[in-house]
Amino acid sequence: MGHP
């Protein structure tokens, strides 16, 4: 969720 911290990355696309």
Curated annotation (Swiss-Prot):
Protein name: Carbon monoxide dehydrogenase large chain
Subunit structure: Heterotrimer consisting of a large, a medium and a small subunit.
Top-level taxon of origin: Bacteria
Top-level class of the enzyme under EC nomenclature: oxidoreductase
Cofactor note: Binds 1 Cu(+) ion per subunit.
Molecular-function GO terms, alphabetical: carbon-monoxide oxygenase activity
Known function: Catalyzes the oxidation of carbon monoxide to carbon dioxide.
Organism: Pseudomonas carboxydohydrogena (Seliberia carboxydohydrogena)
Record-annotated disulphide pairs: none
Reactions accelerated catalytically: CO + a quinone + H2O = a quinol + CO2
Annotated transmembrane regions: none
Enzyme nomenclature, EC number: 1.2.5.3
Cofactor(s) listed in the protein's UniProt record: Cu(+); Mo-molybdopterin cytosine dinucleotide
Taxonomic lineage: Bacteria, Pseudomonadati, Pseudomonadota, Alphaproteobacteria, Hyphomicrobiales
